[in-house]
Amino acid sequence: MSSKRDYYEILEVSRSATQQDIKKAFRKLAMKYHPDRNKDSDAEEKFKEVNEAYEVLSDEEKRKLYDTYGHEGLNASGFHQGGFNPYDVFNSVFSGFDFEGGFGDVFSQFFGGGGSGFHNQEYIEEVDVNLVHEIKINFLEAANGCIKNVKYTRQVTCPDCNGSGSADGDVITCSDCNGEGFLVEQRRTLLGMFQTKKTCPSCKGEGQTIKNKCKKCKSRRMVDEVVERKVSIDSNVFYQDVVIVRGEGHIYKNLVGDLFLRVKIEPSRVFELRDNHVVVNVLVDPLVAITGGTILIPTLKEIKEINLKAGTKNGDIITIANGGINLKLDSRVYGANYNQKGDLIVVINYARPSEYSKQEITKLKEFIKPNKEVNLYETLMKKELNNKDSQ
């Protein structure tokens, strides 16, 4: 199995995301991790991951292949055989943007900021107001759908300073960057002089400094808020592990983010999912299988009693129609099985025989008769050994 991270997880989008959603997520993350802007040790690796994920998910054919077969399907098709340049992807998406002034100007162009400079607060707030939270549910909750009470911490506009960060509203223009929020750096490269803009360390990109800081938020403009929300989760979560709850992310002034709920499904010791079908292995006493009788089987709703016909063999399958999960995914992307209700597939497994008394064993021996399958095996075995001796 591939050790690569899930492409949807990398771009922080759900499996039902539109191309517009995917492109928007890519632009945000590509800017965040671009090595010329982010100096963290792992930024370049994350930048490559983001670009690789976008190259696949932005292409309908590659996306369908990935949705159906995962990374292994892409490997088989030759996608991961080299020649991938993440900067080619980045440049194709951001073609038409002016990079001469550095990344600060790109932010202004992309997000429509009227002012110059990296302190474009609209951009920073837009990418920061979305919130990712993780919850765990069990297999039956996912299969049947459930409503979970989700408790998490988000940030909201500080009520004391109304998001200004100042206790008295008095702010001072930063003298280091003259209110621009950025400092210009020039460096010589093989391609000539390259000019970049980096965040002003004095004002942290705000263009202003605060004399009397708000005591409640310590000039951070936002404070923590613990919230609880009831979230509905359906069986699609098996294949779309991110549930988006609109308007429940961070809140800053008039900007309201979304809650990206990453759902982890705990594995079941009883059930196994195959497409939209649910497989369950049931242990049966061999004598009950031979003579027939009633057995108990687990379904997604309850424990059910069914009649087992005489002569049931080890490995026999009993299919209960519409006993699987009900998926409502785009069949054009996932396939026909992912847009309908599946079946419950019961696999019969012989348990170890019960212990019997000598009298019971003697009585059972009376019913032993030649077994055609055993006889055939013994014939083949003898033939194999006889051929060996004759050589």
Curated annotation (Swiss-Prot):
Q: Which InterPro entries does this one have? A: DnaJ (IPR012724), DnaJ_C (IPR002939), DnaJ_domain (IPR001623), DnaJ_domain_CS (IPR018253), HSP40/DnaJ_pept-bd (IPR008971), HSP_DnaJ_Cys-rich_dom (IPR001305), HSP_DnaJ_Cys-rich_dom_sf (IPR036410), J_dom_sf (IPR036869)
Q: Where are the zinc fingers (CR-type)?
A: 145-226
Q: Cite the entry's keywords alphabetically.
A: Chaperone, Cytoplasm, DNA replication, Metal-binding, Repeat, Stress response, Zinc, Zinc-finger
Query: How many cofactors are bound and how?
Result: Binds 2 Zn(2+) ions per monomer.
UniProt xrefs under SUPFAM superfamilies:
Chaperone J-domain (SSF46565), DnaJ/Hsp40 cysteine-rich domain (SSF57938), HSP40/DnaJ peptide-binding domain (SSF49493)
List residues binding Zn(2+) 1: 158, 161, 214, 217
Repeat region (CXXCXGXG motif), residues = 158-165, 174-181, 200-207, 214-221
Which cofactors is this protein said to need? Zn(2+)
An example of a Gene Ontology cellular component annotation for this protein is: cytoplasm
Location of the J domain:
6-70
Where in or outside the cell is it found?
A: Cytoplasm
Q: Which residues bind Zn(2+) 2?
A: 174, 177, 200, 203
**What does this chain do?**
Participates actively in the response to hyperosmotic and heat shock by preventing the aggregation of stress-denatured proteins and by disaggregating proteins, also in an autonomous, DnaK-independent fashion. Unfolded proteins bind initially to DnaJ; upon interaction with the DnaJ-bound protein, DnaK hydrolyzes its bound ATP, resulting in the formation of a stable complex. GrpE releases ADP from DnaK; ATP binding to DnaK triggers the release of the substrate protein, thus completing the reaction cycle.
Family, per entry: Belongs to the DnaJ family.
| PANTHER family for the chain | CHAPERONE PROTEIN DNAJ (PTHR43096:SF48), DNAJ HOMOLOG 1, MITOCHONDRIAL-RELATED (PTHR43096)
Its assembly, as annotated, is: Homodimer.
Q: Please state what the annotation says regarding this protein's domains.
A: The J domain is necessary and sufficient to stimulate DnaK ATPase activity. Zinc center 1 plays an important role in the autonomous, DnaK-independent chaperone activity of DnaJ. Zinc center 2 is essential for interaction with DnaK and for DnaJ activity.
* Name of protein: Chaperone protein DnaJ
Q: Which organism is it from?
A: Mycoplasmoides gallisepticum (strain R(low / passage 15 / clone 2)) (Mycoplasma gallisepticum)
